[in-house]
Curated annotation (Swiss-Prot):
Keyword Zinc: yes
Gene giving rise to this polypeptide: esr2
Gene Ontology terms for molecular function: hormone binding; nuclear estrogen receptor activity; sequence-specific DNA binding; steroid binding; zinc ion binding
Signal sequence region: none
Stated name of the protein: Estrogen receptor beta
Comment field on protein domains: Composed of three domains: a modulating N-terminal domain, a DNA-binding domain and a C-terminal ligand-binding domain.
GO BP field: cellular response to estradiol stimulus; estrogen receptor signaling pathway
Amino acid sequence: MAVACSPEKDQSLLQLQKVDSSRVILSPVLSSPMETNQPICIPSPYTDRGHDFPTIPFYSATNFSYANPPAISDRPSVHQTLSPSLFWPSHGHVGTTLPLHHLQARPQHGQAVQSPWVELSPLDNVLTSSKSARRRSQENEEGEVSSGGKADLHFCAVCHDYASGYHYGVWSCEGCKAFFKRSIQRHNDYICPATNQCTIDKNRRKSCQACRLHKCYNVGMTKCGMRKERGNFRDPQMRRVTRLSSQGRTSGPSVLNGPAVGPLNTPQPPALTSKQLIERIMEAEPPEIYLMKDMRRPLTEANIMMSLTNLADKELVHMITWAKKIPGFLELGLLDQVHLLECCWLEVLMIGLMWRSVDHPGKLIFSPDLSLSREEGSCVQGFLEIFDMLIAATSRVRELKLQREEYVCLKAMILLNSNMCLSSSEGSEELQSRSKLLRLLDAVTDALVWAIAKTGLTFRQQYTRLAHLLMLLSHIRHVSNKGMDHLHGMKMKNMVPLYDLLLEMLDAHIMHSSRLPRRSPQQETVEQCDAPARPHSPGTSGPTNTWTPSCTGGRGEPQ
């Protein structure tokens, strides 16, 4: 017997028709009596709107050997299969599983079965409905995520554009990801044309490469910051992690119980080893500076001072670039960066002068095309004492056989230790910047110890050499103070025009120092005692306060 189904919109009965008969009988599915020895065929070609259900096979009692199989040789429409198809009408589909099961697990009991179809038990209904509800809730959740659009989108931590993924440890867009990749692969030396405070956003991210790279490091981008969680974003666990991460960024820091998940941790730049730090500092070394003009003979005081100030101004430009390349220097506060350079610029120039002159006894190599002997330097008034101090310090460097790794570490320590006692503010930003400065200074000190240990000396010899190298810094500071006094005196006498950058650095060094000028008793008044005097710069109106700060007494001496 075959069943032909004619699905109508409002009909809940199936039409049962014999193969060899033209009568159509309407009978309910559950209440109609059926023959137990014949298969049921419901080959209705039904397809629901928007739902495509697979064919569900059902088997009659004939397949389980507890009834005699009927003779079906005269029924060509059934063919050789006993596995008919069942399709449900469209108005009866409510998104749940079929409410009818076949007695497939009970043939061994030998019970007399009147019909191959039975209703589900209440427990089966509960289990089926719970599975269906769970499936619907999961589909609804995925639908909300897909239809929510930008609800779960992330923004680039650098330029605040839409992020394309988790790159180098942070959420970033394709542009910032590619820019950071190029920067770390090619070692580009970017220089900010302004004050390293350029605004980096979606529209102005290409205006300053130096500030853009600085912001990449500030937000946590690192070469080793690979994404640990690379699962599908549609996974429920991944959605919960990213949703919690976005809430943490908007609502501030919170204490989480249990282990932290990868994307929730703010990735920190990996700490450099002592060897890597020295390599980075050596790569930051400025190139050789040439005077690019012939010295007139015989040498005069004005001629020598003009050449020396010209070289100093050129070296100051490269010194700023060198300081920016030192790992961790740009992480300091901007005021600290400026103060460090203003307080140590002459010391940095002098240790570089000693390093260039170490192989030329009795001479000072200011540049490859400018070298002065003691006799030539004596023509500058007050310069001979400074010249002798520089020659003596250079001889000490030669005796210690200073290595290049040790030299770059000492030079970096001069920069980082220059204004250690001048900062008096106690704000949170100042304290944080100071702690970064101390950590950076400790890292450079460890690198110096590593460079000394690499020479193969014993522990006692290493400690002794470290002490001797550190004592060089005090000699350089002493010579620098002498040189600052001499340069300031030349400026007051208008002996030589000073360039803008050199003049600014000279005035800033005097201003940041704690040494105050001592006025003569005839000029002292109550108002003058309350207000400290400031050195007069050329080109400004007002009385000229001519004084030369002493390097040892802590007070200025009148001229």
